[in-house]
Each structure stands twice: as structure tokens, then as C-alpha cells.
């Protein structure tokens, strides 16, 4: 498979996930930069410049989304899995060794936050995920390093 096709597929999937997030209407109600106490473990406030950082970020979001009780996020979580696979193919094409990122070390914190404020966590996570995906889309055009 030509690597340009993989890169195009990656961008298309990113755009699809962004559209899915937009379709969940309540995600529009919070800024991705808004500071919400207890949710600082959710990435999305810093630029994502490398393929390994993209994979790590997606691993964290995937872990967060699969822990949420909401059914809205199941397809998005599946899409993130596929997106991570595509990033690994891109990394391999650049001779990058991309270890399979595992996400958050401490799920205890996540469980407590979800119990206390599941709705807020979902809104903030999806909003920041959307911002992170937009960053990734932009970075892919710049041919990111390992």
C-alpha cells in the first residue's frame, strides 16, 4: 500500500472522528482550553508534534472513552483504535520504532472523576480530543517525525 494512501486514509479518519464529535451536540458547550478541576489528566492543551506523541494521546483518549458510561462514544473509541493502527503504519514507513502506548497509568483517578461528574468529563474529553485531532491533521501535512 503506498504510504500516501495511508496518510490520506489517516486524515480522512481524523475528519470522520471530528464530524462524529460535532454530531454529539453537547460537546459545543465547553472550550477545550477551559480549566476544569480534576480533569487536568485529559490531554489536549499542548501541541502534538510527533507520531509517538499522537499515539500516546490517542491511547489516553481511548482509555477515557472506553471508561465512560455514555453510548455516544463507542464508535469514536473504535475509530481511535483504527487511527492508532494507521499511525503505526506511518511510523513504520519512516523506520520509526513506535511502542504501543498504553494510556493513563492511574485509572483510579478517572473512575472517581467519572463517578462524580461523568457528563462534564465527557464534554471536556470530546472537546479536547477534537482539538487534538485538528492539531494532528495539521501536523500530518508537515510530515511529523517519530
Swiss-Prot record:
Note whether Disulfide bond occurs among the keywords: yes
Please give one Pfam family short name: Leptin
Q: Which InterPro entries match?
A: 4_helix_cytokine-like_core (IPR009079), Leptin (IPR000065)
Any Gene Ontology biological process: lipid metabolic process
Function comment: Key player in the regulation of energy balance and body weight control. Once released into the circulation, has central and peripheral effects by binding LEPR, found in many tissues, which results in the activation of several major signaling pathways. In the hypothalamus, acts as an appetite-regulating factor that induces a decrease in food intake and an increase in energy consumption by inducing anorexinogenic factors and suppressing orexigenic neuropeptides, also regulates bone mass and secretion of hypothalamo-pituitary-adrenal hormones.
Instruction: Give the GO molecular function terms.
Output: hormone activity; peptide hormone receptor binding
Secreted among the record's keywords? yes
The cellular location(s) given in this protein's UniProt record come to: Secreted
- Gene name of this polypeptide: LEP
Query: Mind telling me what this protein is named?
Result: Leptin
Identify the GO cellular component terms for this protein.
Answer: extracellular space
- Where is the secretion signal located? none
Q: Which UniProt keywords apply?
A: Disulfide bond, Obesity, Secreted
Q: Which residues pair up as cystines?
A: 96-146
Q: Which family does it belong to?
A: Belongs to the leptin family.
Amino acid at each position: 500500500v503506498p504510504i500516501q494512501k495511508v496518510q490520506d486514509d489517516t486524515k480522512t479518519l481524523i475528519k470522520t472522528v471530528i464530524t462524529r464529535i460535532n454530531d454529539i451536540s453537547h460537546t459545543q458547550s465547553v472550550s477545550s482550553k477551559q480549566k476544569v478541576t480534576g480533569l487536568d489528566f485529559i490531554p489536549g492543551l499542548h501541541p502534538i508534534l510527533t507520531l509517538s506523541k499522537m499515539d500516546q494521546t490517542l491511547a489516553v483518549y481511548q482509555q477515557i472513552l472506553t471508561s465512560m458510561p455514555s453510548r455516544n462514544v463507542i464508535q469514536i473509541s473504535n475509530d481511535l483504535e483504527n487511527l492508532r493502527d494507521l499511525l503505526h503504519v506511518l511510523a513504520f514507513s519512516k523506520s520509526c520504532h513506535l511502542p504501543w502506548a498504553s494510556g493513563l497509568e492511574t485509572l483510579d483517578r478517572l473512575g472517581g472523576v467519572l463517578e462524580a461528574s461523568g457528563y462534564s468529563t465527557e464534554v471536556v474529553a470530546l472537546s479536547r480530543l477534537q482539538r487534538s485531532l485538528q492539531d494532528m491533521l495539521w501536523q500530518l501535512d508537515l510530515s511529523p517525525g517519530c
